[in-house]
Amino acid sequence: MANILRKIIENDKGEIKKLEKTAKKVESYADAMAALSDEELQAKTEEFKQRYQNGESLDQLLPEAFAVVREGAKRVLGLFPYRVQIMGGIVLHYGDVAEMRTGEGKTLTATMPVYLNAISGEGVHVITVNEYLSERDATEMGELYSWLGLSVGINLSSKSPAEKREAYNCDITYSTSSEVGFDYLRDNMVVRKENMVQRPLNFALVDEVDSVLIDEARTPLIVSGPVSSETNQLYHRADAFVKTLTEDDYAIDIPTKTIGLNDSGIDKAEEFFNLENLYDIDNVALTHYIDNALRANYIMLRDIDYVVSPEQEILIVDQFTGRTMEGRRFSDGLHQAIEAKEGVPVQEETKTSASITYQNMFRMYKKLSGMTGTGKTEEDEFREIYNMRVIPIPTNRPIQRIDHDDLLYSTLDAKFRAVVQDVKRRYEKGQPVLIGTVAVETSDLISKMLVDAGIPHEVLNAKNHEKEAHIIMNAGQRGAVTIATNMAGRGTDIKLGEGVLELGGLCVIGTERHESRRIDNQLRGRSGRQGDPGESQFYLSLEDELMRRFGSDRIKHVLERLNADDEDIVIKSRMLTRQVESAQKRVEGNNYDTRKQVLQYDDVMREQREIIYAERYDVITAERDLEPEIKAMIKRTINRTVDGHSRNDQEEALKGILNFARQALVPEDAISLEDLKEVGEVTKRSVNYDAIKVYLTELADNVYDRQIKKLRSEEAIREFQKVLILMVVDNKWTDHIDALDQLRNAVGMRGYAQNNPIVEYQSESFKMFQDMIGAIEYDVTRTMMKAQIHEQSREHVNERVSTTATGNIQAHQADANGQEIDFSKVGRNDFCPCGSGKKFKNCHGRKQF
């Protein structure tokens, strides 16, 4: 272990030496740049662009370009980047993570690589954790970029598509991670290229990169729409049932936070819902509602996982920042289950139209880099998932903060009393205190205890984060006491007030350890910025969440031996700190495995998503007639359907093909059974199915030509073809995403049968994807052949093609011959005799199977 640590430290030292060498090159240009007039310095940007166009690489331009930014910052902002900031900028340019301590000037550091990469003209995205920071940084640093001749845009969720397009077309665009992700998804749902807002993704520089790429990585970005509201009743029924259970009826696995019914719970469910077998295949949907109701009632905790707003809405609490996540909802029906639990109006369940994880979103950039104060603990994940190294940058001045060993109490009550006593002592001498809590309810409890102790203070949690920047800025003033849930207020510096240095600087008190060491380090890092003095102290109890889940029995025995009756007894030792960090490493390992699994599932979907989005983009941008593509779809649909029916009994096969032709290809009176028998040279023993394929293809080509002639102009034809394909693709893709969600839930259970769920998911999702392609081609064929076409102006084509853009398409979907079809002899995997081209189990046999 010691050898591994030594190797890591030596590697870091080697990197620092290389960075210092390049930084010195940058510094060597300082005098030359200082001698230039404003106009000459500003002209450098155009010179760099020209040199880049002439073949010089950005790496070659780096020393001079960084020097231009340094001199520009001095003249425009009154700031001159230190050597350590130049080193951080070099790390960022090369696509790695720069670990820079709080207060070391990350925002100014970013200006150098952002400027250099903007020279290519392909766009730079600066990603922040919230819109307040996007606006603040774009306004402050935008002065410098604009002065140097670069355009700066801010991409906010409230902006119109035209404003977003303008922001993305700038050299430098400030945005949040979620907004970039949603814009990407929305761009792949539009009908026309001119409605897209993004350019191809080039270079992203992510501020607080650990928060975005690690903490958010388990949360997929989802664009969804409502489904039938009849399901609301099931949420209430499942909730009513779950509330009748006792602790003996279900089992909770605390480390993984999963829950399931015991045998007694299953018996009660079967009695409550009047079922013979709860886990019968017909009850799959019901078990989903029961599972969600169990999680909502016995796993999800009010004021910790969510809060109920005054408007009677359930708001998610971000476990890493303590902020409420406006507009976000738990997926898979869990949010509705919580609404039923809390007795607030149950909002309509939604169906996913498009989704992507943060991991796959950011891996699409040509180059990705990031800054954070705490990234080293997650280095393996950055390297394995994003191919980024974490390089710690030395501080400009030595750190003077004193980090005290943890204090452990036996009960929560004893711990909180000790916290209040410590705060009171420091408040009385005027030292500012920042109290970090993990949950909203903890901050409320401590606030009440401080009020009782007569200590004035500010509370910063999920309930009032609008004021957070202002509260955090004043947290370093003499006598200030501030309670912050996790690291709300991250990104805003705490500057020390007059006379505070002499009192020991800002004291940070943690009321419990977070499950991630990184979050603890972020809290500690609020104190001791830029070489200021400071202190940090964590208070723990055996009743803390982390200690209950992963705490060592050894610690509990030590406390019991010391004094079982005195709850105010306290342990302070290095052994305790090591035990706590060991528990945190176990949790971090679990969380990493979870994120990795999310990525493995999304990687399967990513391949399919990229195929669909590439095909979509090809259709949207096509200036050509799409007739060859559509006729190829029609031909494949005919071949697929005829081949499918050819495996059946001869008479049934011919009837199935006839139904298909009448329903999807030609008018009813244009083809008869006798026609097929004649073309197929039918005898008692054989049918020439190849001849039938050729015959049907010729008929379909004639119908296609007649349909197209109804459109008078080339533009109208192309418009019709595009909307036809996009409408079908979007509908089928949405259904496919929904089916993949259900498949993922189903294969999870197969792990118990010794099958690898990921392998099963890959295999079955591939088959489903092939089926979806077949269904797309069938629907394009049927709609093309059966549409009632009439001219309609371009403006009237509805934008939301995924559900309503029928534009000038109105398809006949009734059974062509109006006769009842006998399904009694049809096998589960046979093609449906209705002529849809689907297997019976996925068509008219769906209810039966």
From Swiss-Prot:
Membrane topology listed for this record: Peripheral membrane protein
Keyword Nucleotide-binding listed: yes
Binding site for Zn(2+): 832, 834, 843-844
CDD domains the UniProt entry points to: DEXDc_SecA (cd17928), SF2_C_secA (cd18803)
Annotated positions binding ATP: 85, 103-107, 493
Subcellular location field: Cell membrane; Cytoplasm
Catalytic reaction equation(s): ATP + H2O + cellular proteinSide 1 = ADP + phosphate + cellular proteinSide 2
Domain of life of the native organism: Bacteria
Cofactor note: May bind 1 zinc ion per subunit.
Cofactor(s) needed: Zn(2+)
InterPro entries per the UniProt record, alphabetical: Helicase_ATP-bd (IPR014001), Helicase_C-like (IPR001650), P-loop_NTPase (IPR027417), SEC_C_motif (IPR004027), SecA (IPR000185), SecA_CS (IPR020937), SecA_DEAD (IPR011115), SecA_motor_DEAD (IPR014018)
Keywords of this entry: ATP-binding, Cell membrane, Cytoplasm, Membrane, Metal-binding, Nucleotide-binding, Protein transport, Translocase, Translocation, Transport, Zinc
NCBIfam families documented for this protein: PRK09200.1, secA
Subunit record text: Monomer and homodimer. Part of the essential Sec protein translocation apparatus which comprises SecA, SecYEG and auxiliary proteins SecDF. Other proteins may also be involved.
Family statement drawn from the similarity comment of this UniProt entry: Belongs to the SecA family.
Stated name of the protein: Protein translocase subunit SecA
The organism of origin for this protein: Streptococcus thermophilus (strain ATCC BAA-491 / LMD-9)
Gene: secA
